[in-house]
Amino acid sequence: MAEKKNILTYEGLKQLEDELQDLKVNKRKEVSQKIKEAREQGDLSENAEYDAAKDEQRDIEARIEEIDKILKNAEVVVEDEVDVDTVNIGCLVRILDMEFNDELEYKIVGSTEANSLKGKISNESPVGKALIGARKDDVIEIEINGNSFKYKVLEIQKSN
């Protein structure tokens, strides 16, 4: 079975590439230095600094492997080419919460780069799934954990 594609915006791709570069060039050196300094302290069997540095090294290598895997299976959305007649990945969408009369704005992204605190929601999230394919003035209804939410699509635009 083919691996699932990791859908990324160009911004998300660039962030991952930058993080990978930092991990490989800077973080690896830093943790190697910490391990070297901890070794110089002598007995490694009761050396908390050594254990912490080795744990950090494992975390760094695991993150490098994770990013490599994401990038290997990446499908980049060209945001300039996104159709804004309907909500798609890469769009910026402004919606109205019909219960509270609040306007919300989200960028629809792939699950890898979703971050609700930054207004980026995944196309696989309940709200993202319901919004994909919606048009301006459409009302969508979502049920999450037994609660019903209604949103009206106010505007769809390119995110850049």
From Swiss-Prot:
Q: Which family does it belong to?
A: Belongs to the GreA/GreB family.
Q: Name the segments for region: Disordered.
A: 36-55
| UniProt gene name | greA
Q: Which domain of life is it from?
A: Bacteria
Q: Which GO terms describe its biological process?
A: DNA-templated transcription elongation; regulation of DNA-templated transcription elongation
Q: Does the keyword Flavoprotein apply?
A: no
This molecule's function is given as: Necessary for efficient RNA polymerase transcription elongation past template-encoded arresting sites. The arresting sites in DNA have the property of trapping a certain fraction of elongating RNA polymerases that pass through, resulting in locked ternary complexes. Cleavage of the nascent transcript by cleavage factors such as GreA or GreB allows the resumption of elongation from the new 3'terminus. GreA releases sequences of 2 to 3 nucleotides.
Enumerate the InterPro entries for this protein: GreA/GreB_C_sf, TF_GreA/GreB_CS, Tscrpt_elong_fac_GreA, Tscrpt_elong_fac_GreA/B, Tscrpt_elong_fac_GreA/B_C, Tscrpt_elong_fac_GreA/B_fam, Tscrpt_elong_fac_GreA/B_N, Tscrpt_elong_fac_GreA/B_N_sf
Coiled-coil ranges (or none): 2-81
NCBIfam families in alphabetical order: greA, PRK00226.1-4
> Cross-referenced HAMAP family, in alphabetical order?
GreA_GreB (MF_00105)
GO molecular function, one example?
RNA polymerase binding
Q: What is this protein called?
A: Transcription elongation factor GreA
Report keywords, A-Z.
Coiled coil, DNA-binding, Transcription, Transcription regulation
Q: List the Pfam families hit by this protein, alphabetically.
A: GreA_GreB (PF01272), GreA_GreB_N (PF03449)
